Amino acid sequence: MQPLDVINAAGAAWRSGISVVPVREDGSKRPDLQAWAEYQERRPTLEELVGWYGKRTDPLGRTGVGWVMGAVSGGMECLDFDDADALEDYQARALEFGAADLLGRVMDAYLEVTPRGVHLFWRCETIAGNQRLAADAAGKVRIETRGEGGYVVVAPSYGEVHPTGTPYISTGE
């Protein structure tokens, strides 16, 4: 991964109608903006995007891309599995309850591997806010949605964006 990959990804997402925001490079995974609420309502301008990421011929060295979920990004929603076991459990439960068709449609979504888990993205007309769907016995969230007004770090983010330093990887699907 290199900053040019990040610039290309930020630009491609922006051209696809996604509200893109820069990510802090301190392991917090938070937006690198004083305030980012306005980007829950409007997409950044091309000038703002270039100000955050630079140009292909003159990259600013950013290592992270964030997407704002919801209507501002054309109805984008994310199903966030915080670890690989959570995804396996989800798949097993769906099959156990006879939801193989639904599981197939969900798994056909755009998929990214995160440093610890998996993100599935799709667009739909009606999106609720962020929702916790499953937690372990200690109360740690294992599966949640990132919906209206939510925010997600996406591929090809790498380096200090995540506390582990592990990159986010697109499966290209």
Locations of regions flagged by a protein language model:
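DNA replication initiation modules
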Residues: 70-87, 123-173
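Catalytic phosphate/metal-binding cores of nucleic-acid and nucleotide-processing enzymes, i.e., regions
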Residues: 120
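Signature for HUH/AEP ssDNA processing cores
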Residues: 1-116, 124-126
